[in-house]
Amino acid sequence: MKQYNILMIMADQMHKYALGKIAPYVKTPNLDRLAGEGTLFRNAYSNNPVCGPFRGILYSGMYSRDNGVQKNDEALSETEVCLPQELQKCGYTTSFVGKLHLGGSGNQPIPKKYWAGHEHFLGYQCYNG
């Protein structure tokens, strides 16, 4: 079976009409090409609109009340099995680039325990408080 590449792009507060593939008056040629060659979710909803808790839900597959990330500045448990670890079991190499927002300090290197299971990490934390 062919193993496909998985590229997950997360943007904070990006409305669906900020993508040219859906709203032609917006120019996003690279994102449009990715959406045209991959999967585009036209009706996706978040059950938690806050950055850190949503990322905790996405990575753990559990509601905020169950994964322990109910507000920004909280981290997933070190024992939590996350999406990157499940992908590794299927032979994928996982990497993260950008803002993770799942624990650690915005002013210090991020300890591996906060990498949400990624093998490679080039990221930072961002706290809005």
Regions found by a protein language model. Give the residues of each.
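Formylglycine-dependent sulfatase
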Residues: 1-129
